[in-house]
Amino acid sequence: GGDSFIMENTPLTEATYFIMLSLSREPRHGYAIMKDVQSLSEDRVILSTGTLYGALKRLLKQGWIERVEEELDSSNDEESGRIRKAYTLTSLGRRILEIEINRLHVLVDAANLRTTGAEA
């Protein structure tokens, strides 16, 4: 069923998690994903281009993200109107990310419970 599919595909690696998180609000192109992941992870995850594009290729193949065309809206005339590839989460990708976030919440809640001594 759907549950076994989810189990096989989570937990996500940190790189995959942050890439998907980066795409959860709006489509982004490769370089913007790299910068965003670095900032979101507070420098824990610094992606090389090779790692990023390998991950994007895999995510496209899994159907978790898709390519969209983004028209550059730039004040620089040369750039303006040029199309570049951006990536966005699919509805399946959103579902996977949501499940992973819930999984992480459970892990953190357990730690909080144990370390604050709040358990019965």
PLM region spans:
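Short, contiguous hydrophobic alpha-helices characteristic of membrane insertion segments
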Residues: 7-9, 63-64, 118-120
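Exposed loop/turn and edge beta-strand positions of beta-sandwich/beta-sheet ligand-binding modules
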Residues: 83
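N-terminal helix-turn-helix DNA-binding core of bacterial DNA-binding proteins
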Residues: 8-51, 70-71
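Beta-hairpin "wing" of winged helix-turn-helix
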Residues: 60-80, 88
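Amphipathic alpha-helical dimerization/coiled-coil segments
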Residues: 1-4, 92-120
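Basic amphipathic alpha-helical segments that dock to polyanions
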Residues: 52-59
